[in-house]
UniProtKB/Swiss-Prot annotation:
L-serine binds at residues 233-235, 287, 387. It comes from the Bacteria. Gene3D superfamilies: Bira Bifunctional Protein, Domain 2 (3.30.930.10), Serine-tRNA synthetase, tRNA binding domain (1.10.287.40). One of its GO terms (biological process) is selenocysteine biosynthetic process. This is Serine--tRNA ligase. Catalyzes the attachment of serine to tRNA(Ser). Is also able to aminoacylate tRNA(Sec) with serine, to form the misacylated tRNA L-seryl-tRNA(Sec), which will be further converted into selenocysteinyl-tRNA(Sec). Belongs to the class-II aminoacyl-tRNA synthetase family. Type-1 seryl-tRNA synthetase subfamily.
Amino acid sequence: MLDLKRIRNNPEEIKKLLSNRGEDFDVAVIDEIVTLDEERRKILVEVESLKSKRNQVSAEIPKLKKAGEDVTEIMNDMRKLGEEIKNFDTRVNEINERIEYIMLRIPNIPNPEVPDGETDEDNVEIKKWGEPTKFNFEPKAHWDLGTDLNILDFERGGKVAGSRFTVYKGLGARLERSIINYFLDKHTTENGYTEILPPYMVNRDSMTGTGQLPKFEEDAFKVENNGYFLIPTAEVPVTNMYRNEVLSGDILPIKHAAYSACFRAEAGSAGRDTRGLVRQHQFNKVELVKFCKPEDSYAELDKLVEDAESVLQGLGLPYRIVRICKGDLGFTAALKYDIEVWMPSYNRYVEISSCSNFEDFQARRANIKYRETPKDKPKFIHTLNGSGVAIGRTVAAVLENYQKEDGTVEIPEAIKRFMNVDFIK
């Protein structure tokens, strides 16, 4: 959520900054907010004047009665004044609801470093690590490898649940678990994160706090009759752990690493990546979430990206980093980097992590603040998050990049201690 004061003072600047944001967003609502805010402030001034008048007259009525004067007309005037105040209060409530409705749907303002552009083709590559894997044979796609090795069962996943669900079997299940363990160990013992195991269901306030609601409700799995949502990412419960709290500045930054299952309807992705593990309704992920002071947030973002990189480097998977352009930035981020792993079956890099600085956008929605001392006025914190990284896509990348001509898959050195085998065959 943006700062209403900033909108009030600089509406044209805000409209300009949001005009090429790439969201389905009409900047004309900024003018509506300014108009409503001005009306509300005028009403509040008028209400205060009316209440002051009512209090003064109310204090005089007993004196007039004691003096034997007729106060009938004055009492009638007071009732009318009370109705007027009530009507003003009703209008203020209507304005508040409308402003909140609009504010919850305004995307974040891009950082000046965000490149111009409309689609993912305009994202800017800033780094490559490793070289795309070369083969002296025709490599298989991970869905074929998984089926041939009897470690991924897409058919039974579909039978049990439907399309975009997978059953992991045998060494496939162990590979998934090994990668989870490796990621969590790396982030907690080397990268300085505290491990969190969050709830997999959250309430509406939590989904609103991180920006999934109201805009992306169609992509969420909702549990009917009780208002719970299955989490699309551990970012939601971990960020909302501190909702409506004022944190002490001396404990910042807070760094959490959370493994969870994630659930997404993928309503806008019909026909995309329909085979394999790349786009599933349910998948596992290790999420990195940070809370820090505003002046530290971009340095913390750089470190967050490095932490996500570290697990891919440990697995020896080639990847690149792109800075996301304005048109592809999404709703909540002020600046975002995608880490894309090389996927031989696609003959291109595929997103495996997004690392974002939301600045105070989520903190305003979730009301997360900090202060240096108990006497200081609380200020909104900055929140960041990144995938550290998506597990299913890592499984796919390992299978494809480590496959051998005989159809077996070598286990990366970093996870052999968890797998207890050198090859899947």
